[in-house]
A protein has these predicted regions:
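Conserved acidic
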Residues: 1-224
Length: 224
């Protein structure tokens, strides 16, 4: 508290709070750019509906078995790497209407590098490969009827409505097939790198973490 000039009122509740504060401070000089693309209520509601966490699921064909001599690996600093190397929405989202909501046009927008967030309806949804180890769609993130699930993941459904980003849609199209796919609503934005001021904060935290790990009391990057 003394080092950062905090009081009980301003003290971040978690370690992430310090990172958020540094990011906000770095972006303060261009706050007008950030404020100009903030979503309105309708856009925010669709973004929240499309939000999902990490993709973790047990293979239903391996349940109850003890596997010997298995291996695993961890990708170091995966989230910062994505922020540093990928493009993200950098403009206000624009709603599509009319013919633009046809799936062929949605796919064209994605091919041209646009961020697309939409709500899709799948009729006769089913896995392309019935032995798919990690089905992507979670029942809790959809409105589905006459469905078959494995520990919360959809294997099939007569009707399934769900909100997806363009990244999610590509995964769903790769894993599932359907008799019919329709887009109820969708919005698009141009993608580009995150602001340099924000990326500089990411770089600093990564460098600090790496120095600590490689120090005399830390672990090396290979051990991380």
């Amino acid at each position: 508290m003394k080092r950062d000039g905090d009081t009980l009122h301003t003290l971040p509740l978690t370690s992430t709070g310090y990172v958020r504060r540094d990011a906000k401070a770095a972006l303060w000089p261009i706050r007008w750019k950030i404020e100009s693309i903030l979503p309105y209520q309708r856009e925010y509601a669709l973004l929240r509906a499309a939000f999902r966490g990490g993709d973790t699921h047990a293979n239903r064909y391996k349940v109850g078995k003890i596997l010997e001599n298995v291996e695993s690996y961890d990708e170091t600093s995966a989230y910062p790497a994505q922020q540093r190397t990928r493009n993200f929405p950098i403009t206000t989202f624009r709603w599509l209407s009319g013919e633009d909501l046809q799936m062929s046009n949605i796919i064209d927008y994605i091919r041209h590098g646009r961020a697309v967030v939409g709500r899709y309806v799948f009729s006769g949804l089913r896995l392309r490969n019935e032995r798919e180890p990690v089905p992507y769609l979670s029942l809790s993130k959809t409105q589905s009827s006459s469905f078959v699930v494995d520990n919360g993941r959809l294997l099939s459904a007569d009707l399934c409505t769900t909100a997806l980003t363009e990244i999610d849609l590509a995964i769903v199209m790769r894993q599932y097939c359907a008799d019919k796919i329709a887009c109820e609503e969708a919005m698009i934005a141009r993608k580009g790198p995150l602001p340099k001021q924000y990326l500089d904060v990411i770089d600093k935290y990564y460098q600090d973490k790496t120095m600590l790990k490689n120090g005399p009391d830390g672990e090396t990057e290979d051990e991380a």
